[in-house]
Amino acid sequence: MGFDEFQPGDKFHFDRSKLVMCLYFTFAEIDGASQGAAWFCPVAVRATEIDSVVGGWSRALACFLHRFFLGDHGAQTVGIPFTYQDRDFVIFAKLSNLVSDGDGFRKAVGWRGASSLRPSLVHGNVLKKDSDLFARRPGFVEIDCADPSLLHKTTTAEFQDSCDLVAEATQRYNHGDISKAMLDNIKKTEGLNYIPGGLCFDPRLRGLIEWFDAVTVDWMHTFLQEGVMNVEALLAIHAFVLDPNLFKAFLQDKPWNFPHAFQFKGQGLWRIFSATRLDDTGEVDKIRATASELLGLYSLLRHFLFTEVARPADLNANWLSFTACCDLLDYITDVKKKLVPMSHDMLCRKITIFMLAHVGCYGSQYVKPKHAWMWAVAERWLLDTDVWDAFIVERLHLRVKQIAAPLRSLHRLERTILSGVLNDQMRNLQTFHGACCLLGNSPFALSSLPDTLFGDEMHVLGMLLRVDDVVFHGDNAGLLKACVLEDGVLYGVVELWQPIGVVTPHAKRWHSQTGDVRLIDACEMDQAYNIGPIYLANRK
């Protein structure tokens, strides 16, 4: 389950009156949960309406969870009945993941946020930087901690005790028993605000819906949304005195060939270094990029620094810090695409390597609360079998956007949005075939192979692959020639290329048109992020 605010329109035409909080859910067992058609939108409510309710979004979320899981037709109590192919079924479900960004959790939980004394919702012994408190009492660390063994994950019981303390302190203050200063100190030390009827303070949910255990700090916001990679990329640009115009030309002028699914965004990455995103002097004072843009940029920045920029020995520590961050992001994306096993221990080792490299180079000056959130991302890997993130929530917002943007009247806005989203989803479900399926309206069969379907595009574990995309199979690169479905299994017809040289640890040169055509299981393939001149395949 994920939730986030969304404002229909564009960056030049803001309409605060249409700011909508949307909540989406899916079932983890659904094959193809990475596709939008598998996600449902039961809640879309204007922020202005939420703000008029005592308890705001926190109370609204608590009421929804109670009704959805514990109500008269609750998924956790009596189940959800349905009929399929003349057979009756009942689905029972409980909350496993609750995904949002930091601001979303602040509104939903009453958490005081990343700038508070306790900047981590998941680890209760992490304190803000330069608090001068962690050394006074054993068991506490600050956000620059690089040792996961020193972290303490807050239990549900401990969190509920903190909520009870804040609620009681608020009640005593209202009765005049304690001062405002004491109340503020209690809220500061617990890292929570009191929200009447809110998620933390609703007794109906306790012991029945373990929502705190379901809190999922996602890697997308942690690394790519004013996050860890934003900081690290900016520091690398400054350390190596990178000319933004030179890098913009590198992105703009070379004939990069991106996968069809990312072609539009990939070909526009140069805009990150255009004049409108730089400071008044034309320098890079901040990485102004969306999460998807930064995800496409970091590998190209690494390649550019490796091949086009001198790296003197005195900047070796800066280089190690940047590449360790890139390696960490490489690993997370590989796990998400199921190319490598999901390992909590491996993720923690990579976070430790990066944090030691970063703090060893820069100290704690540039460490942000989101550096501590990396450990919260790792905590979920002990419980989950898939990598859940907010990318799907951002994509689902597009479904809401196409319905809400043209609306001029606010009368019954929520009903209009929800009915439109439901109708759109019903149409999408007509072509939904799971995590791995052929796409498009014209798959065809050959007379010699009547039970085999061929197509130009397929969906594979969250990836959109299309004919003429460059793909990887292990360490081999090649060109996708056709998409094939046979006996319920997806394959790619791939012309493998011949490697002719290593450029960097992440890029090789290849000779194309080898004639070595093979049938490869689609689940074993990966996308090449970008292809440069002379068939330079840059995997990450």
Regions found by a protein language model. Give the residues of each.
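Charged (Asp/Glu and Lys/Arg) segments that form or flank catalytic channels of large polymer-
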Residues: M1-F6, L65, L70-E308, P312
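Structured nucleic-acid-interacting core domains from mobile-element enzymes and related host factors
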Residues: M1-S17
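Short helix/loop capping segments that flank catalytic or ligand/cofactor-binding pockets
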Residues: G9-F12, S34-Q35, K128-D132, R399-K401, ...
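A generic structural signal for short coil/turn motifs at secondary-structure boundaries
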Residues: D10-F12, D51-V54, V309-P312
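Compositionally biased, low-complexity linear motifs
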Residues: F14-F27, F134-G139, I403-Q425
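E2/UBC-UEV (E2-variant) core
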Residues: R16-I80, K129-H175, K180-L183, E486-K540
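Catalytic cores of large soluble enzymes that bind and process phosphate-bearing ligands
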Residues: G56, A60, R112, E293, ...
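Terminal interaction-prone segments of large eukaryotic proteins
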Residues: N257, Q263-K540
